[in-house]
């Protein structure tokens, strides 16, 4: 009986080890290799693996996705929540938003933001968007490896939204959660 229990435990440990084996992920958009040269002269490749703590499979997004966009931290996000000159936009898809978001955020998915610039103070005209009355937008998605908000911000700028009115919270929900800050279910 003891042998049977030992064999079962050994097999379950082996299965568990295989199931949590890390998946290699890109660090940045292209397949670039980063190498650190140690004091001994040994070269050590820097890798990124999908582990239980690495929640997203994307790749690191630049701190400033486009020239003119202002990067912000949690402090600026907290200050923007009740500031009438700002709108906090969760640029993730509706399923992510409905699960949890930052209090006070509205959901404009990254795939829709260019069609909904009127909600951000722009006027639709025959020649395109007039964004002279645009509000300040704090945009975020799932975190440093999430491409959704940078994609949305590029589309906003392409369609006439002023880059200097876009504030990018690159840390997104990953950092917000890691810091233990309050979240709410998204309200449509």
Give the residues covered by each predicted segment:
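Mid-length scaffold segments of soluble, non-membrane domains
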Residues: 70-136
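A mature extracytoplasmic/lumenal domain signature
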Residues: 92-95, 101, 112, 141-143, ...
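Positively charged n-region of N-terminal signal peptides that target proteins for export
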Residues: 1-4
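Active-site neighborhoods of enzymes that stabilize oxyanions during catalysis
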Residues: 179-188
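Catalytic cysteine-centered active loop of the rhodanese-like fold, especially the PTP/DSP P-loop
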Residues: 121-176
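Flexible, polar/low-complexity N-terminal or interdomain linker segments that lie immediately upstream
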Residues: 17-99
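Bacterial N-terminal signal peptides
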Residues: 6-15
């Amino acid at each position: 009986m003891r042998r049977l229990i030992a064999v079962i435990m050994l097999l379950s440990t082996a299965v568990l080890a295989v199931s949590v084996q890390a998946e290699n992920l890109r660090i940045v958009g292209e397949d670039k290799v980063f190498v650190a040269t140690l004091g001994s002269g040994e070269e050590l490749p820097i890798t990124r693996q999908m582990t239980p703590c690495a929640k997203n499979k994307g790749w690191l997004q630049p701190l400033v996705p486009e020239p003119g966009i202002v990067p912000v931290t949690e402090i600026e996000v907290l200050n923007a929540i009740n500031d009438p000159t700002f709108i906090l936009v969760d640029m993730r898809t509706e399923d992510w938003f409905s699960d949890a978001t930052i209090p006070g955020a509205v959901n404009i998915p990254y795939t829709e933001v260019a069609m909904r610039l009127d909600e951000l103070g722009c006027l639709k005209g025959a020649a395109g968007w007039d964004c002279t009355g645009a509000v300040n937008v704090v945009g975020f998605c799932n975190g440093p490896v999430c491409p959704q908000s940078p994609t949305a911000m590029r589309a906003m700028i392409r369609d006439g939204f002023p880059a200097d009115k876009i504030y990018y919270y690159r840390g997104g929900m990953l950092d917000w959660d890691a810091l233990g800050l309050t979240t709410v279910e998204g309200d449509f």
